[in-house]
UniProtKB/Swiss-Prot annotation, chain A:
Source species of the chain: Mus musculus
Lipid biosynthesis found in the keyword field: yes
Example of a GO MF term: molecular function inhibitor activity
Protein name as annotated: Thyroid hormone-inducible hepatic protein
Feature: compositional bias, Acidic residues: 90-104
Expressed in which tissues: Mainly expressed in tissues that synthesize triglycerides.
CC per GO annotation: cytosol; nucleoplasm; protein-containing complex
Family: Belongs to the SPOT14 family.
Region (Disordered): 83-104
Curated annotation (Swiss-Prot), chain B:
Species the sequence originates in: Mus musculus (Mouse)
Family statement drawn from the similarity comment of this UniProt entry: Belongs to the SPOT14 family.
Tissue specificity of this protein: During embryonic development, expressed mainly in the neuroepithelial midline, urogenital apparatus and digits. Detected in adult white fat, liver, heart, brain and kidney. Expressed at very low levels in lactating mammary gland.
GO terms under biological process: lipid metabolic process; negative regulation of microtubule depolymerization; positive regulation of fatty acid biosynthetic process; positive regulation of ligase activity; protein polymerization; regulation of lipid biosynthetic process
Organism taxonomic ancestry: Eukaryota, Metazoa, Chordata, Craniata, Vertebrata
Name recorded for this polypeptide: Mid1-interacting protein 1
Length: 150, 182
């Protein structure tokens, strides 16, 4: 696996995006049969399995779909909303989307551009770092299950 | 093996949004030779900007302010002044460009002055996210959060890019205006 880290400084958001993209691609290459990941949980730090945590297959599809946005840019708003509505059609989710938008407006009003920038920039950085680690865990778990541990 | 760079050539990619912003700030940086000329000049919105080109008093302000570029210390003071003039916008835009180019994590964050007025500071976000990482709750909506912040960053970047362009144009106008008088 080759990660492009030389073009940008280590902490740059673009480096983090590159790394995420590469790790997810690697995961996709390793996981030949994604359905094997169904109903498999990631074990916690102490080997405990958390109740109600999503299974690895859920992670796998989520990580892949986020990777599309990392690589190709933002989905148009309508497309994103259609996607969310398609995945979860419950009323609660729609309400959640509405409150999220209200929340968004509220934040935009409260914060100046600098604070907004830092909020989104730092959050993206952390979410991507976290997701990169998740992708690595999914890959490793799959390799364990299929006996490919190197 | 990984052809990551190619995929960045998409119109809406974050990479392009950042590059546009960095380009606009670089352009501003090159245009504004004497940043202190921007002190006390209000940054108008584009609508107002187009109508009132002959901003009253700013020409006189230019003649008075012929001091060389200020020291970094004085820059910090005006940067967090409650009412922002063009100069503080100039400093802000450059500092955000540096954050994009070099990352923000290892920089000493929020300055003492003005930090109490905003409840959302990078530190809070760090705490919030480390909490998120340890807790099982919130895992499912990571995708939503990611999308939300990506969209937010796009919006902010396009606003900032516009601001940098307005500032560059205003500076050119100011310079042109003062030359016109002589």
């Amino acid at each position: 696996m080759q990660v492009l880290t030389k073009r940008y400084p280590k902490n740059c958001l673009l480096t983090v995006m590159d790394r995420y993209s590469a790790v997810v691609r690697n995961m996709e290459q390793v996981v030949m049969i994604p359905s094997l990941l169904r109903d498999v949980q990631l074990s916690g730090p102490g080997g405990s399995v958390q109740d109600g945590a999503p299974d690895l297959y859920t992670y796998f599809t989520m990580l892949k779909s986020i990777c599309v946005e990392v690589d190709h840019g933002l989905l148009p708003r309508e497309e994103w909303q259609a996607k969310v509505a398609g995945n979860e059609t419950s009323e609660a989710e729609n309400d959640a989307a509405e409150t999220e938008e209200a929340e968004e407006d509220r934040i935009s009003e409260e914060l100046d551009l600098e604070a907004q920038f830092h909020l989104h920039f730092c959050s993206l950085h952390h979410i991507l770092t976290h997701l990169t680690r998740k992708a690595q865990e999914v890959t490793r778990k799959y390799q364990e299950m299929t006996g490919q541990v190197l | 093996m990984m052809q990551i760079c190619d995929t960045y050539n998409q119109k809406h990619s974050l990479f392009n949004a950042m590059n546009r912003f960095i380009g606009a700030v670089n352009n501003m940086d090159q245009t504004v030779m004497v940043p202190s000329l921007l002190r006390d000049v209000p940054l108008s919105e584009p609508e107002i900007d187009e109508v009132s080109v002959e901003v009253g008093g700013s020409g006189g302000c230019l003649e008075e302010r012929t001091t060389p570029a200020p020291s970094p210390g004085s820059a910090n003071e005006s940067f967090f002044a409650p009412s922002r003039d063009m100069y503080s916008h100039y400093v802000l835009l450059k500092s955000i460009r540096n954050d994009i180019e070099w990352g923000v994590l290892h920089q000493p964050s929020s300055p003492p002055a003005g930090s109490e007025e905003s409840t959302w500071k990078p530190k809070d976000i760090l705490v919030g996210l480390s909490h998120l990482e340890s807790a099982d709750a919130g895992e499912e909506d990571l995708e939503q959060q990611f999308h939300y912040h990506l969209r937010g960053l796009h919006t902010v970047l396009s606003k900032l890019t516009r601001k940098a362009n307005i500032l560059t144009n205003r500076y050119k106008q100011e310079i042109g205006f003062s030359n016109w008088g002589h």
